[in-house]
Amino acid sequence: MTVLKMTDLDLQGKRVLIREDLNVPVKDGVVTSDARILAALPTIKLALEKGAAVMVCSHLGRPTEGEFSEENSLKPVAAYLSKALGREVPLVADYLDGVEVKAGDLVLFENVRFNKGEKKNADELAQKYAALCDVFVMDAFGTAHRAEGSTHGVAKFAKVATAGPLLAAELDALGKALKAPAKPMAAIVAGSKVSTKLDVLNSLSTVCDQLIVGGGIANTFLAAAGHPVGKSLYEPDLVETAKAIAAKVSVPLPVDVVVAKAFAEDAEATVKAIADVAADDMILDIGPKTAEQFAELLKTSKTILWNGPVGVFEFDQFGNGTKVLAKAIADSAAFSIAGGGDTLAAIDKYGVGADISYISTGGGAFLEFVEGKVLPAVAILEERAKA
């Protein structure tokens, strides 16, 4: 994957527009989870150190396009950046017709989705973004799967279009895990439905040696193998699909599970052998024996890709499976990459973030890359690098 990299450019005195993913949760005007901002800070600092006039843009939430809304304003993000950088970071609302920014200055542009044509990737808007800068830096991996004005369109028209350090690191890490992984490779794919992760499962079945499934996905594979799943969430119409995937790659199945009679925070958890699952049981986690067996598989792996908790870890009595696997990944010497919102929440809960080789900032973009799909915002950077 050949793209121009911001780190290789002389940015002294240049007007640099950086597209970051600062779409963070905000409550009562305060940022409640800063992970994406923290991930973007090194890029912003580097551009300033290189002597650039720095303009940062992002979306936040899903406002009606072209209309300002207070709840989707980047004002709380500007306040957070000001505090984190120890300098005033002005929020600029009217910037499309040009803005005065000097070398060493930093401004944050208001939500790009307040601009008409952003989501439709309108050329007229993209050209206005491009006219603001000498160098465009795409650094928002989390939105790279969307062809929008500030992710794709601007890169078509900017004088120079480059990948920022965060985006470049994501592409390198994912490439390392998927293009030429050190073997053996294990993947953990968990979630409620096979249907939503079907392309991920199919893609990984061609590169990994062990495909560990969890959640509702595992229930469909258990049913495909003839095991009882009680009243657990599963997809009967995808049983044949599960069989076909299991014929291509080793899919180790749980030997024991944690069940309950209801899906509730105070539900009583019972460990059962898989053969003993009753008609009124719901499978809500893998059992302790299974967790240990899967942990052993992870210990011998050289590459691990993790997407999704294997149980309802939000309720502690159904969190042991995810906790054991999280610790096993952290303890492993393998190159490990993790991605997806629930996965990141599990990493936070069990405090293993420092011991995972790479944590992806992208949810949908992470999955689409794993599926082997082209990410439009990356494809345009590759095109521009060739030109």
Swiss-Prot record:
Belongs to the phosphoglycerate kinase family. Substrate binds at D21, L22, N23, R36, H59, L60, G61, R62, R113, R146. The keyword Thylakoid does not apply. Disulfide bonds: none annotated. InterPro entries: Phosphoglycerate_kinase, Phosphoglycerate_kinase_CS, Phosphoglycerate_kinase_N, Phosphoglycerate_kinase_sf. It is found in: Cytoplasm. Its EC number is 2.7.2.3. Its main location: cytoplasm. HAMAP family: Phosphoglyc_kinase. It is an enzyme of class 2 (transferase). It holds the Pfam family PGK. It catalyses: (2R)-3-phosphoglycerate + ATP = (2R)-3-phospho-glyceroyl phosphate + ADP. One of its GO terms (biological process) is gluconeogenesis. SUPFAM superfamilies: Phosphoglycerate kinase. The gene is pgk. It comes from Pseudomonas entomophila (strain L48). ATP binds at K197, E314, G340, G341, D342, T343. Keywords: ATP-binding, Cytoplasm, Glycolysis, Kinase, Nucleotide-binding, Transferase. GO terms for molecular function: ADP binding; ATP binding; phosphoglycerate kinase activity. One of its GO terms (cellular component) is cytosol. This is Phosphoglycerate kinase.
